[in-house]
Amino acid sequence: MSLELEWMSIDDLKLPSNVIDIIKNRGIKKLNPPQTEAVKKGLLDGNRLLLTSPTGSGKTLIAEMGIISFLLKNGGKAIYVTPLRALTNEKYLTFKDWESIGFKVAMTSGDYDTDDAWLKNYDIIITTYEKLDSLWRHRPDWLNEANYFVLDELHYLNDPERGPVVESVTIRAKRRNLLALSATISNYKQIAKWLGAEPVATNWRPVPLMEGVMYPERKKKEYTILFRDNTTRKVHGDDAIIAYTLDSLSKNGQVLVFRNSRKMAESTALKIANYMNFVSLDEKAISEILNQLDDIEEGGSDEKELLKSLISKGVAYHHAGLSKALRDIIEESFRKRKIKVIVATPTLAAGVNLPARTVIIGDIYRFNRKIVGYYDEIPVMEYKQMSGRAGRPGFDQIGESIIVVRDKEDVDRVFKKYILSDVEPIESKLGSERAFYTFLLGILSAEGSLSEKQLEGFAYESLLAKSLVDVYFDRAIRWLSEHSFIREENNTFTLTNFGKRVADLYINPFTADIIRKGLEGHKASCEIAYLHLLAFTPDGPLVSVGRNEEEELIELLEDLECELLVEEPYEEDEYSLYLNALKVALIMKDWIDEVDEDTILGKYNIGSGDLRNIVETMDWLTYSAYHLSKELRLDDHSDKLRILNLRVTDGVKEELLELVQIGGVGRKRARLLYNNGIKGLGDVVMNPDRVRNLLGQKLGERVVQEAARLLNRFH
């Protein structure tokens, strides 16, 4: 799999001088071995390639050269697809360089119920797999001009949640010109054949990686690290992770520690912080970070205070429970070497590029969500993603990745499974009813109408075994027909109006069916019932429900103000989801009743990032439910769902809906204005001095002008 280490001069590329200059202005004089091999395999001639290589090996520049070369020769549009919004933003900033030679670059994600007609004016579009999938369903004319696709992080095909969408997008994209980029995968030849692409596979890294396993010795407070080259090192300390962290810091390195849960990430960060007195920090830089934390509105006050106490010692934790704004500050501070240690959950390894000299993997086990009390070993791919963060180009001569085990007897097994083994082969994740039915609905929405043979042809283009396609295809057609999502006439399948609306809203057909049954079977209901119905769907958000909480939720079921729209299930798994949905509904009820964010976070034991994710998901689901109720002509429900959706979006009572239309006026400022007699747009315009006194001169003036603009638009 390794390539000859051949480096190519930038001047030897068959690209215009202005393109060469942009690359040189980044300080790049030579292409590294993976980049050189991609060029040799016809990257600049538009050849279809699958490039697999480790993190940090320069895959983005390969994509840039491929896109620019193709567009200069052929015109059209190029679409760069990533699995994460954070990566989309990162790539967008990189591609902005090409605007200096005339290419228009755009970024789009979220808001699935639109065709983004404005993108017709752009040449290079950066987006997510989900957003591109939703755009294809809307069939915008401009998308027909897209003739070059870059599929980034293609190993997400193996992700149980994201895999079906990545596969669906890939099936459509591989009918056009494409470049696929992936972390190292074991069955790359099979995937390349599926794509109709030539494989370019390499293990080359810009910084050599030393991998090892760390175990405790019988002698108290002594730990040995056995490295891949059979060398060993000993460290001493109260705790294995702390001991190796301090050892790395003493050599002026930065450290990423991975733990398997949020609580472990936070507690480990606190422990490490207690030992940071000897580490030299830039006090001015630390002070700037603390001021940044004070300036942002996102995030609970408790988590901010905890982070401030840690960051003052050069340490931070990082997990999905934190707000995006807090995570962004932590990541940027680490990149600039202001923070020395981050303790994170594995989600960080799959996200933005954030290398460190040393990576410590504190756990190879994680909780099994389906079986309480059980743990699973992490996949090899997850280990490779974490260890791949070790070694920062330009700063480190080597990167070190260490797995911590509890017993010396585990060393050999862990070494063989994670360090010496290939990652798991990529396999289709369309092999479930939920995934396959959604896939077919999306294909029909994008194509308009297809014969049975044509529709089946798309399914056969998946990675799913033909025998499984045959089983799922017949089931899917039958279920989608019986539930009025599709119709068949003259051996041609099309979507019903309801099916098309479901596809455009980008919700799962099982979600739509649950919503339809809940609404059609009941008269207009209360907020908690609507919220519970939507949270109970397959697209609903999941939250952790403790055993004590379960008992409280069961008691609450008896005291609700109205009848729920979902029948209480008998099966244990379904009942757990039923209680999960009730907790989500209660969180959202407090949110729309303007309960303070800190109170919500403490009451339900969630992070500010969790709350934001729940709000975004329920915003999408209330919006979808409103539009489905309109499609089904359930007017009693649609009136209530429209108001509920608006309240969920901003977290306000109905009386504030007019005020929160004003840019810069959120739930807190709207309540401040309302309680001081400013109850609508007209009041804002008629009382500018009072508004300025309440909000400050600068913001107040902007709010008055925006309110006047909105009033003019409405009249």
From Swiss-Prot:
EC number, as in UniProt: 5.6.2.3, 5.6.2.4
Residue ranges constituting the Helicase C-terminal domain according to the UniProt record: 236-442
Native source organism of the sequence: Saccharolobus islandicus (strain REY15A) (Sulfolobus islandicus)
Gene for this chain: hel308
Protein's name in the database: ATP-dependent DNA helicase Hel308
Cross-referenced CDD domains: DEXHc_archSki2, SF2_C_Ski2
Annotated positions binding ATP: Q35, S53, P54, T55, G56, S57, G58, K59, T60
Gene Ontology terms describing biological process: DNA repair
Keyword presence, Isomerase: yes
Any single Pfam family the record assigns to this protein: Helicase_dom4_arc
